[in-house]
């Protein structure tokens, strides 16, 4: 069985995701937070309450469960195309969510071309039933088109102002950043095993998880737009465009567009005078304006 275009709207049974403060602390370190970010990396510092980065929603409210509903495809053809989160309440340092995932859309770009699968996750408080977090994950299945689905349309990209950005936030990553991030759940050897990365994937060395890059950008947005308060960031969406290698410095470039809204890109500086490499594009963020 190939990809089933009739699986749009299919949902999974609720799954309970539970986490501790250790998990949220480890995640923060996994996306590069450190001694200058004690609100995210410690739970017992004097006068500092622990906060949880908004991008932790990709861990505690994952949308990937619904991928099992779309039929069969070659997993080696899968790329993570884009990621969005929306928070309706701040994520607690330790907690639990009842998560239901759904096949939101499937697009068939034609025989021998790509298939696009959009998955949605909704995480609710298991006691009150109130919606806490939503995630939207786009998967690109290379060469898996031609299964009789609708071609569909790519969502409109946000418009970027034709002016200098309002902020540029540089955040370095560690050489072992992927080894830390993988402890939050994604053990794909592409990010840790040099043999796998070079011999099977064609990279010169293991690459950083796309969602780690997304989390580093989230830290920059919390710092610049949220004033260091995680709860002030309510939505982040971006498209993955290029790989990142551990040890590279990520620069998140931000334009405020209207009260409570901004657009952003994240890039890696080019070497030997080359142009910067955009690794996250079409970024859009909503926040509580001060």
Swiss-Prot record:
Reactions performed catalytically: a (3R)-3-hydroxyacyl-CoA = a (2E)-enoyl-CoA + H2O; (3R)-hydroxyhexanoyl-CoA = (2E)-hexenoyl-CoA + H2O; (2E)-octenoyl-CoA + H2O = (3R)-hydroxyoctanoyl-CoA; (3R)-3-hydroxydecanoyl-CoA = (2E)-decenoyl-CoA + H2O
Pfam families the record matches: MaoC_dehydratas, MFE-2_hydrat-2_N
Extent of Basic and acidic residues compositional bias: 151-169
Keywords: Fatty acid metabolism, Lipid metabolism, Lyase
A single BP term in Gene Ontology: fatty acid beta-oxidation
Residue ranges occupied by any MaoC-like domain in the UniProt entry: 161-271
Region annotated Disordered, chain positions: 147-169
EC number: 4.2.1.-, 4.2.1.119
Family listed: Belongs to the enoyl-CoA hydratase/isomerase family.
Role of this protein: Shows trans-enoyl-CoA hydratase/3-hydroxyacyl-CoA dehydratase activity. In vitro, can hydrate various enoyl-CoA such as (2E)-hexenoyl-CoA, (2E)-octenoyl-CoA, (2E)-decenoyl-CoA, (2E)-dodecenoyl-CoA and (2E)-hexadecenoyl-CoA. May contribute to the persistence of the tuberculosis infection by inducing COX-2 expression in macrophages through MAPK-NF-kappaB signaling pathway.
Official protein name in the record: 3-hydroxyacyl-thioester dehydratase Y
């Amino acid at each position: 069985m190939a990809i089933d275009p009739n699986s749009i709207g299919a949902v999974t049974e609720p799954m309970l995701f539970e986490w501790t403060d250790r998990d949220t602390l480890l995640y923060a370190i996994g996306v590069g937070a450190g001694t200058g970010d004690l609100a995210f990396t410690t739970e017992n510092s004097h006068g500092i309450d622990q906060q949880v980065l908004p991008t932790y929603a990709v861990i505690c409210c994952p949308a990937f469960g619904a991928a099992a509903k779309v039929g069969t495809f070659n997993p080696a053809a899968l790329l993570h195309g884009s990621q969005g989160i929306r928070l309706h309440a701040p994520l607690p340092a330790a907690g639990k969510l009842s998560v239901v995932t759904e096949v939101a859309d499937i697009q068939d770009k034609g025989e021998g071309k790509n298939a696009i699968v959009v998955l949605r996750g909704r995480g609710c408080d298991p006691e009150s039933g109130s919606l806490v977090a939503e995630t939207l994950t786009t998967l690109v299945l290379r060469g898996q088109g031609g299964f009789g689905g609708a071609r569909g349309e790519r969502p409109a990209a946000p418009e970027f102002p034709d002016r200098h950005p309002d902020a540029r936030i540089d955040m370095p990553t560690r050489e072992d950043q992927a080894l830390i991030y993988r402890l939050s759940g994604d053990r794909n050897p592409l990010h840790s095993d040099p043999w796998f990365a070079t011999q099977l994937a064609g990279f010169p060395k293991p690459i950083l998880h796309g969602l780690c890059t997304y989390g580093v950008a989230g830290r920059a947005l919390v710092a610049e737009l949220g004033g260091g308060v995680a709860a002030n960031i309510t939505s982040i969406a971006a498209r993955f465009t290029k790989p990142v290698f551990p040890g590279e410095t990520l620069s998140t470039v931000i334009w405020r567009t209207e009260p409570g809204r901004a657009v952003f890109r994240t890039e890696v500086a080019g070497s030997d005078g080359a142009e910067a490499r955009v690794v996250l594009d079409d970024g859009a963020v909503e926040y509580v304006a001060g």
